[in-house]
Amino acid sequence: MSKVIGIDLGTTNSCVAVMEGGDPAVIANSEGARTTPSVVSFQKNGERLVGQVAKRQSITNPDKTIISIKRKMGTAEKVAIDDKNYTPQEISAMILQKLKADAEAYLGETVTQAVITVPAYFNDSQRQATKDAGKIAGLEVLRIINEPTAASLAYGLDKMDTNQKILVYDLGGGTFDVSVLELGDGVFEVKSTNGNTHLGGDDFDEKIMDYIAEEFKKDNGIDLRNDKMALQRLKEAAEKAKIELSSSTQTNINLPFITADATGPKHIDMNLTRAKFNELTEGLVQDTIEPMKKALSDAGLSINDIDKIVLVGGSTRIPAVQEAVKNYTGKDPSKGVNPDECVAIGAAIQAGVLTGDVKDVLLLDVSPLTLGIETLGGVATPLIERNTTIPTRKSQVFSTAADNQPSVEINIVQGERKMAADNKSLGRFTLDGIAPAPRGVPQIEVTFDIDANGIVNVSAKDKGTGKESHITITASTNLSDEEIDKAVKDAEKFAEEDKKKKENIEVKNNADQIVFQTDKALKDLGDKVSAEDKSNIEAKKEALSKVKDGDDIEAIKKATEDLTQALYAITTKMYEQSGAQGAPGADPNAGASQKTNGGADDNVVDADFKVDNDK
C-alpha cells in the first residue's frame, strides 16, 4: 500500500509530511526547503513555475504571478492568464502537484492519497473546493481536517497519557483560527472553534506596504500602489521587514530605482522600527482576541481552565502577537511545536490513523457554523448547532403551509441569525409529489448529514408517500470570508432584534393556526353549535382576521387569546353535551406547535414550509 501524505495547503506557504517508522517527518522540497511558497507563475514561453522559483521572479512578472489563492477558494472568482481563466481550485491544484511530486521523489513511489488541512472556519464550499483541488492534482483526499486540530495532534501525540485542555491559536498567512480542545486517553476532542478567514500575515504585510507607500508619496508625490511592478517590490520588502522585526528592533528598507519621473530615478531608503510596526498592526492583533473569548465561551471554559497555549502559523512569530496572547491568557505559549510545520505533521498523523499506522488515536472535530432551513415567516430553524461534533446526522419533521400543497422548496441556510434572510443560503431543492392533504397533515422529514470532512448532505422525505429528494451542498461559492465572520458578529449585535422578530412571527403563526382551527371546528360541528355561540365566535374570528396581518403584536395576541377562549368554550360545551371522549376539531390550547392529528411525531416543530407557488 502506498503512503498517504499529510498536506498543509497554506495561503503563503505550504508543507507536506508523511509517517515513517511510526513518526511524522516533514518532506523537503526539490530546492531543499521544508516549506514551499504557495505561488504560481506563468512564463511567456508557456512554462509554469510553482513555489520558490515562482516567488523569485514575481517582481519582474507581476501580472502572471498568483499569490494567496487560498483566499479565493470556494468563490466563483477566476484568474485570467493570457487567454485562459483559471479557477482557484486549478491554481491550488498546481501547488498540490508540486508537493505531490516532491513527496514522490522523497519516498521513491507514486503517491495517490492525502489528508489536507483547511482553516477551522472554512465553510462547506471552501472545503469542497479543497477536495476538488486535490482531485485535479491527482490525489484522493481521504480526509479534510481543521488546521488547529492538526496542530493539536502534532503537539499531543507524545502526551496521550495526560489529560489537558489546549487552546490552539493559529495565525497563518491569510487566515486566523482558534480552537479549544480536550486531550485525554488518546482522544483529541474539539470543544469549540472560532476565527476569521480573512485575517493573516498578508494583512500585516499590507500595513507596512501602505506605510512605505504613504511616506514615499509625501516626499515625492507619486503613489507606488498604481505601479504593479513597484507594488510587488513593496510587498516583498514588507514581508522581509516583518520577518526581520521578529528578531530585531529595527530594519532597513532599501529599494533603489523603485520608480522614476521627469527629474530622474527615485529610491526608497528608510528605517522601520518594531515600535512603529506594532503601532501599524495593533488593530490586527486586537482582532484576534475576541475569537479567543468566543471560543472559550462556546466551550464553557474560562482561561484558567486551559492548561496549554499552542501557537501555530508563521505570523505567531511576531512579538506583539505573542505578547497579546500572553497578556490575555496569563500563560506563556508552548514552544513544543514548529509553527510552520506542525499542521502538516498533524495531517500526516491523521493519515496514519486512517491507514492504521497510528494506533489508539481518536479525533473528534466540530462544525463551525449553525446549519438549518428556512420555515414559515422566514425563520431560520436550526437542525445542527455550531460546534457540534462531526460526523453527525440530525433529522426533524416539518409540515406544509397550505391545503393540498403538492411540493415544498427547502432552503438550506448557514449562520447564527434567527431570520433566514440574514444568514447565507447554501442551496435550495424541491420535494415534489406530496399527496393532497390539509395543511399541517403531511410529515416531511428533513435530514442533515455532515461527514468527517465537514461537507453537508441534505435530504427530505415525505413520510406518507416515501417520496425523497436530496442535495449535496457544493454550490455555496458566494459565501465570502467577511460574510462568515459577519454572521457571528451580527448574531451577537442583533440578538435581541432577532429574538423579537422571531417572537412576532410566532405570534402571527399562532393567529393563523387558531383561525384555521376555528373554521375546521365550525365545519365539523355544524348544526351542533347554537346560533348565538356561532355568532360570538365568528365575531372574534373577524376581529382577529382584521389585525393578524398588521404590526400591532399586542392586539394580535389579545385577539388570538379571545378567539382561543371562545373556541375552547364551545368545544367544551360539545364534550359535555355528548359525553364523547374525542369530539371533532382540535384543542386550541394545544397551540400552533402541535398537529391536529393525534399521531403527531414528537419530533415535529412549530415551523412550516413556504408555499412553492411555481409548482
Curated annotation (Swiss-Prot):
Q: Keyword annotations for this protein?
A: ATP-binding, Chaperone, Nucleotide-binding, Phosphoprotein, Stress response
Phosphothreonine-modified residues are where? T175
- Record GO terms (molecular function): ATP binding; ATP-dependent protein folding chaperone; unfolded protein binding
> PROSITE patterns, alphabetically?
HSP70_1, HSP70_2, HSP70_3
Q: Which InterPro entries match?
A: ATPase_NBD, Chaperone_DnaK, Heat_shock_70_CS, HSP70_C_sf, HSP70_peptide-bd_sf, Hsp_70_fam
Lineage: superkingdom: Bacteria
What residue spans carry the region label Disordered? 578-615
Q: Report the induction information.
A: By heat shock.
Q: What does this protein do?
A: Acts as a chaperone.
**Matching HAMAP family:** DnaK (MF_00332)
NCBIfam families reported for this sequence = PRK00290.1, prok_dnaK
Q: Which family does it belong to?
A: Belongs to the heat shock protein 70 family.
Protein name stated in the entry? Chaperone protein DnaK
Q: Which organism is it from?
A: Clostridium acetobutylicum (strain ATCC 824 / DSM 792 / JCM 1419 / IAM 19013 / LMG 5710 / NBRC 13948 / NRRL B-527 / VKM B-1787 / 2291 / W)
Identify the gene encoding this protein.
dnaK
